[in-house]
Amino acid sequence: MSQKEIWYETLHANFGQYFSVDRVLYHEKTDHQDLIIFENDALGRVMALDGVVQTTERDEFIYHEMLTHVPLLSHGNAKRVLIIGGGDGGMLREVSRHHGVEHITMVEIDAGVVEFCRQYLPNHSAGSYDDPRFNLVIDDGVNFVRQCSDKFDVIISDCTDPIGPGESLFTSDFYQGCARCLNEGGIFVAQNGVCFLQQDEAVGSHKKLGHYFKDVSFYQAAIPTYYGGIMTFAWASNNPALRQIDATTLRQRFAQSGITCRYYTPDVHIGSFALPQYLLSALQNAQ
């Protein structure tokens, strides 16, 4: 029996995780980053950019459901949604399940990611790239929100970690542009890393977002691939009530949507805003 190739993630210098590689489906350096898609017995197809795992078939639903349904159901009447990043198509798939949404714009810096993922991760997008409400823009996210004249009800930043091309999506320029592009009553959410290991990222985002939004917080979910504990998602709006929607209202909205989820429930939604004390203390000490 031949020994399987081992792929090591390089996100952290002193510790990490590895994956056995059953088969490499694609590996190439695009114009912006090094992209690999391979098969793993336990997690299915795995995509990594610049040595960091972005998504796996086995657990992607947790990430995509939480980053989509929490803001959309909190808003309650989102018509226009902007996705920054999200080239694997999972976020688009979940947003497109909301039939009340009339227009979905996705801004992806790397056209290669979209092409490769449509071919090698078809279950992520599940045909949503063909949704007539969808518009794909190949551009840098910061540049787009700086120049865009359109307004959106929900903005989802499905960004990579703040290294390489994803670094700009954690800057004040980006957050300011997103605030400018939101309609009144709009909500901004973003991937913000595993807070036990990447606490500085959460503190930095909280500080920067606070300059442009009246209500800034985080919510969380545990996603096995993103090891180290709970992953945090940044939340920003100018209406604190949107973060405190009652369970009855959420249940009604969720039932009316007709959406069936594998992770998200209205109760999970409410509980996700309960944060561990170590993060609350770090945010408080940074003020």
UniProtKB/Swiss-Prot annotation:
<feature type="binding site">
    <location>
        <position position="33"/>
    </location>
    <ligand>
        <name>S-methyl-5'-thioadenosine</name>
    </ligand>
</feature>
<comment type="similarity">
    <text>Belongs to the spermidine/spermine synthase family.</text>
</comment>
<feature type="binding site">
    <location>
        <begin position="140"/>
        <end position="141"/>
    </location>
    <ligand>
        <name>S-methyl-5'-thioadenosine</name>
    </ligand>
</feature>
<dbReference type="Pfam" id="PF01564">
    <property type="entry name" value="Spermine_synth"/>
</dbReference>
<keyword id="KW-0808">Transferase</keyword>
<dbReference type="Pfam" id="PF17284">
    <property type="entry name" value="Spermine_synt_N"/>
</dbReference>
<dbReference type="InterPro" id="IPR001045">
    <property type="entry name" value="Spermi_synthase"/>
</dbReference>
<dbReference type="InterPro" id="IPR029063">
    <property type="entry name" value="SAM-dependent_MTases_sf"/>
</dbReference>
<dbReference type="InterPro" id="IPR030374">
    <property type="entry name" value="PABS"/>
</dbReference>
<feature type="binding site">
    <location>
        <begin position="158"/>
        <end position="161"/>
    </location>
    <ligand>
        <name>spermidine</name>
    </ligand>
</feature>
<feature type="domain" description="PABS">
    <location>
        <begin position="5"/>
        <end position="238"/>
    </location>
</feature>
<feature type="binding site">
    <location>
        <position position="165"/>
    </location>
    <ligand>
        <name>S-methyl-5'-thioadenosine</name>
    </ligand>
</feature>
<comment type="function">
    <text>Catalyzes the irreversible transfer of a propylamine group from the amino donor S-adenosylmethioninamine (decarboxy-AdoMet) to putrescine (1,4-diaminobutane) to yield spermidine.</text>
</comment>
<protein>
    <recommendedName>
        <fullName>Polyamine aminopropyltransferase</fullName>
        <ecNumber>2.5.1.16</ecNumber>
    </recommendedName>
</protein>
<dbReference type="GO" id="GO:0005829">
    <property type="term" value="C:cytosol"/>
</dbReference>
<dbReference type="GO" id="GO:0004766">
    <property type="term" value="F:spermidine synthase activity"/>
</dbReference>
<dbReference type="InterPro" id="IPR037163">
    <property type="entry name" value="Spermidine_synt_N_sf"/>
</dbReference>
<keyword id="KW-0620">Polyamine biosynthesis</keyword>
<comment type="subunit">
    <text>Homodimer or homotetramer.</text>
</comment>
<feature type="binding site">
    <location>
        <position position="108"/>
    </location>
    <ligand>
        <name>S-methyl-5'-thioadenosine</name>
    </ligand>
</feature>
<feature type="binding site">
    <location>
        <position position="88"/>
    </location>
    <ligand>
        <name>spermidine</name>
    </ligand>
</feature>
<feature type="binding site">
    <location>
        <position position="64"/>
    </location>
    <ligand>
        <name>spermidine</name>
    </ligand>
</feature>
<comment type="pathway">
    <text>Amine and polyamine biosynthesis; spermidine biosynthesis; spermidine from putrescine: step 1/1.</text>
</comment>
<dbReference type="GO" id="GO:0008295">
    <property type="term" value="P:spermidine biosynthetic process"/>
</dbReference>
<keyword id="KW-0745">Spermidine biosynthesis</keyword>
<keyword id="KW-0963">Cytoplasm</keyword>
<dbReference type="InterPro" id="IPR030373">
    <property type="entry name" value="PABS_CS"/>
</dbReference>
<dbReference type="InterPro" id="IPR035246">
    <property type="entry name" value="Spermidine_synt_N"/>
</dbReference>
<feature type="active site" description="Proton acceptor">
    <location>
        <position position="158"/>
    </location>
</feature>
